[in-house]
Amino acid sequence: MTDVTIKTLAAERQTSVERLVQQFADAGIRKSADDSVSAQEKQTLIDHLNQKNSGPDKLTLQRKTRSTLNIPSTGGKSKSVQIEVRKKRTFVKRDPQEAERLAAEEQAQREAEEQARREAEESAKREAQQKAEREAAEQAKREAAEQAKREAAEKDKVSNQQDDMTKNAQAEKARREQEAAELKRKAEEEARRKLEEEARRVAEEARRMAEENKWTDNAEPTEDSSDYHVTTSQHARQAEDESDREVEGGRGRGRNAKAARPKKGNKHAESKADREEARAAVRGGKGGKRKGSSLQQGFQKPAQAVNRDVVIGETITVGELANKMAVKGSQVIKAMMKLGAMATINQVIDQETAQLVAEEMGHKVILRRENELEEAVMSDRDTGAAAEPRAPVVTIMGHVDHGKTSLLDYIRSTKVASGEAGGITQHIGAYHVETENGMITFLDTPGHAAFTSMRARGAQATDIVVLVVAADDGVMPQTIEAIQHAKAAQVPVVVAVNKIDKPEADPDRVKNELSQYGILPEEWGGESQFVHVSAKAGTGIDELLDAILLQAEVLELKAVRKGMASGAVIESFLDKGRGPVATVLVREGTLHKGDIVLCGFEYGRVRAMRNELGQEVLEAGPSIPVEILGLSGVPAAGDEVTVVRDEKKAREVALYRQGKFREVKLARQQKSKLENMFANMTEGEVHEVNIVLKADVQGSVEAISDSLLKLSTDEVKVKIIGSGVGGITETDATLAAASNAILVGFNVRADASARKVIEAESLDLRYYSVIYNLIDEVKAAMSGMLSPELKQQIIGLAEVRDVFKSPKFGAIAGCMVTEGVVKRHNPIRVLRDNVVIYEGELESLRRFKDDVNEVRNGMECGIGVKNYNDVRTGDVIEVFEIIEIQRTIA
């Protein structure tokens, strides 16, 4: 192979001569532009570049393992503790020569170990064989001896077996009888002891009560004890109260009334044991009859806490959680307060909070999923169809005004960019194009910073990302963001270097800048294809399509064509005549007109389908974008679209999703309100800009809401009172009037009834078609609500030369104005040795015994400081004024 010059090699590598010379210098080879390069020097350069662009020298892997440990605590409760074990391992990349040496050493060591292992196995095999032979001989001898013993013992065993069984049964029976008698004796002694103690205590109580109630002279002491029996049960306490009332009311009628007669109406509130105790309490004194009937407590407190399996759904109230754990609601509230959360008994809490509380109280938690119906509906699908090749879904991404839509226009031979407001894309456009080599579906995403979520949705729904970079502008912020979205979705990237026909185009600069973010061209050893195109001149369009189809062929994209369809919502909006309209990209199956679809919170039957050209179609296969009509509402962009069999079940699932979303949202709102309670109490007055937002499509509503909420500061907050898709209605105008909000319409207009309300209420209605203008005007409105910044500006300095006494003003400072101008009634500071010792107001300013309003630089004057007489020679009087600076939101 002949040597080539530096210039020739630079042309082959499509790089500048200076850069190539610098790369040779970095590799340790000094060359000039006209020098020749040998094959060995080329290889040295390639090795240097590969080493420079190689991966990191050190790789650290971290692993976390979580487990739960039940620890017993005081009170018999057990507490579940979450344990996290963290492991860390670092791999260091070795030098190639060092790696080869270590590999050779390891190989030699493995061979030596293998040789030693084989020798040990052979030795062990020989020993095992010898041992087996010895054991076989011994075994034969033992078996012969044992056979003889068994024959002799068999005869004795048959005769003695029956005698042994009889003896064992008799011994076991005697032992059980002895144990039963012992237990019975102990139980009788314990019961007798308790009855004697109870009887003594009851008699003592009766005597004491009889002495206190001297008016019951005719009653016997034993009858007194029945009236004032120890109140060990609910029935006995009620009987005692009844007896007291009867005695108090019937003192004049007689003393022999039966005082402790229970009422029959109270039997529903007591147990059988309570009624027996009450009867014993009433009749306990008559000859000792039924004295020891049943004074023992029936309920025994558990020795330790009972741990239950608590089943928790996605949301639960505090009261329901307490019932599941069989505790009082106040205990659950106390446990939540210990965890730092305030709650009421009827408050709805989320699953995570309920799980923490239940585990803190020592119970085992079982998390329940409440979407069984949803899973059943989604799993009831056609299966078994074979996968077929499908068209690739390609997303065009890049910075704003880099020519994404214009590039797509040339491919589609239409003029879409001219129809976009301000010439920038503000929706996701979905189109499919037929080429000579096959069909390609394109998604065009907006490049403005506000449409981050739209670009992320585009990357998630795609197979290949075409990254459009202007050759004259290079890599910009949204270009970097598009690269991040593509990497997050693990989608291959094809780079289209646009505007290549401009004289200031520099494609090498684009390659170098993209290489910093991991996008390397194939000629540099990377995986990304770079295609130079011009959307205006049409240069390189065919090469771009070939590159896309080549990448799709490598990916081997397949999908099931027959069966129930599934896909994703790319965009959605509310049409005045057609109702909710959703742009759907079919991923699998075939979507037919009349199918029942479930789409996020919405459902419905497909009444009509149109392609991107507005033509009616009856079906749409994989990778085909269509607009569908017939949904119950406007779905959120990014929702999954699924064809289901039963419309009733689809409606139930949609309603369940709406209810679940609302419950989770309310639980989070309540939690945030309680958490921010003290912050809201301490913060000052905050101005709010209320906005009612209406836009033409769901994606624009989402993007504008995010952008406006990010403008909020500590002093001025943006509050989206209401938002939606479609024109401005009378309801929107009424809401804006009630909340003193600004009405914002993005690519929509107000209807006649709304305009009447707007005129009557003098509402602020603003129309926009470009998102830049909307954000700038809201920012200006917020800036007007900011309090101005106060700044002190020094306007003059005066040096005290002498001090005079005045009967009217006290000490007067004779001064020379050294800088600026001194004005009357301005605030001043008195400085001594460059330290402020007094701050006040200039009360008197005279020149030649005349009052003046100001004295300029270089003139003498007399200054009287208000309420300050400690002016000395050498002090400096600093005169300043306070100016207001209007602040703006950055």
Swiss-Prot record:
Region (G3): 444-447
Region Disordered, annotated ranges: 45-302
Positions with a binding annotation for GTP: 398-405, 444-448, 498-501
Region of interest: G1: 398-405
N6-acetyllysine: residues carrying this PTM: 808
Keyword Nucleotide-binding: yes
Record carries keyword Nucleotide-binding: yes
Biased composition (Basic and acidic residues): 92-217, 267-280
Compartmental location: Cytoplasm
Biased composition (Basic residues): 252-266
Region of interest called G5, as start-end residue ranges on this chain: 534-536
Superkingdom, taxonomy of origin: Bacteria
Recorded GO MF terms: GTP binding; GTPase activity; guanosine tetraphosphate binding; translation initiation factor activity
Pfam families: EF-G_D2, GTP_EFTU, GTP_EFTU_D2, IF-2, IF2_assoc, IF2_N
Comp. bias (Polar residues): 67-81
Segments forming domain tr-type G: 389-558
InterPro entries: DNA-bd_dom_put_sf, EF-G-like_DII, EFTu-like_2, IF2_assoc_dom_bac, IF2_II, IF2_N, P-loop_NTPase, Small_GTP-bd
Region entry G2, spans: 423-427
Alphabetically ordered keywords of this record: Acetylation, Cytoplasm, GTP-binding, Initiation factor, Nucleotide-binding, Protein biosynthesis
Record PANTHER family: TR-TYPE G DOMAIN-CONTAINING PROTEIN, TRANSLATION INITIATION FACTOR IF-2-RELATED
Described purpose of this protein according to its UniProt entry: One of the essential components for the initiation of protein synthesis. Protects formylmethionyl-tRNA from spontaneous hydrolysis and promotes its binding to the 30S ribosomal subunits. Also involved in the hydrolysis of GTP during the formation of the 70S ribosomal complex.
Protein name: Translation initiation factor IF-2
Organism for this UniProt entry: Shigella dysenteriae serotype 1 (strain Sd197)
